């Protein structure tokens, strides 16, 4: 895939992020939130590159999925698009999702799990050179330049047996993460504030 926006996209509704979460929960309750009906995608052995927003993006409909053996690189390097979907892999509600054996490099961010990374496992991935381009200005509170970012969840999230070689290996604004048997060459950043969502000047509480 080579896309000016997103390589693979698993949802279709465009509203404010908080309202999309509410709508998705209501649709799930109405239609039956069952593993047999929701998610369970397999995304395997793709070469996804030079996308200007994200490589693989999922929201609610990506639950119970397996993302494995993909080569994802050169994502958002021109920084022509911004927003909350900027990463090689960006998932909202990565419930019981396995992200394994992917090679992710030269992205503004490597893997970003956002909202409800419950039962998520990130294992056996190789991540390196995931940072903002040299010409880009780092804005206060800017969420870029790391291999893995786990945000607003209570877990459990397991991150194991990965090779993390970027300047920042892990950024956390969450709870319930276990980091086990990783090779880590970069720094850790723990964020305790600044993750509230403001849409059209109004505070949309995440919790």
Task: Give a label for each model feature.
Residues 1-207:
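Extracellular parallel beta-helix/beta-solenoid repeat domains
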């Amino acid at each position: 895939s080579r896309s000016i926006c997103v390589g693979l996209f698993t949802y279709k509704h465009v509203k404010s992020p908080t309202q999309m979460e509410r709508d998705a929960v209501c649709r799930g309750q109405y239609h039956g939130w069952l593993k047999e009906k929701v998610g369970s995608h397999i995304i395997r052995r793709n070469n996804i590159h030079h996308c200007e927003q994200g490589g693989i993006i999922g929201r609610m409909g990506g639950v119970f999925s397996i993302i494995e053996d993909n080569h994802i690189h050169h994502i958002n390097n021109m920084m022509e698009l911004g927003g909350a979907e900027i990463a090689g892999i960006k998932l909202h509600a990565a419930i019981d999702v396995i992200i394994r054996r992917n090679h992710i490099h030269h992205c503004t961010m490597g893997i970003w799990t956002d909202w409800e990374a419950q039962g998520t496992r990130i294992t056996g991935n190789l991540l390196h050179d995931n940072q903002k381009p040299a010409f880009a200005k780092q804005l206060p509170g800017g969420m870029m330049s790391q291999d893995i970012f786990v945000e607003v969840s209570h877990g459990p999230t397991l991150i194991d047996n990965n090779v993390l070689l970027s300047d920042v290996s892990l950024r956390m604004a969450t709870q319930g993460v276990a980091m086990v048997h990783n090779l880590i060459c970069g720094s850790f950043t723990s964020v305790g504030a600044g993750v509230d969502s403001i849409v059209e000047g109004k505070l949309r509480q995440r919790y």
